[in-house]
């Protein structure tokens, strides 16, 4: 037995095992890192146009203007849209890079935003699982809002008279737009 060949073979096997162990470690670390990355962080890192698919299948194309842990603000051809992150069921292109979770601000929650819309009497178009409604939010509760129909037909509020109210569950919100297109 040639001891030099024996040692070279042994070192080669150890080196190969180290490479395999390192590859496995890199895979495990990558998986662990990805497990902590939220959709909000990836949306915040998008530089350029993005397409969101909302619950129900509607596509929204535009640029991410702002994003918190609960909502994303997208500017598209039709103006700005405030979308609860829970309503986003698909998005592209997101790329591989994500903003650090520390970059995703806690920001005002959806309830706070809705209360501010109500306080200011902002005319909105509310896209909801129960249909599209044009009007003003007049009350915000723990899990739903009351919307008072405004002027002009939009979606499912077309048959309402001005001033009629509907209560909409927050879990069904898909998108909010200012009725005249300007925030």
Locate each region found by the language model.
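Short glycine-rich, low-complexity segments
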Residues: 1-183
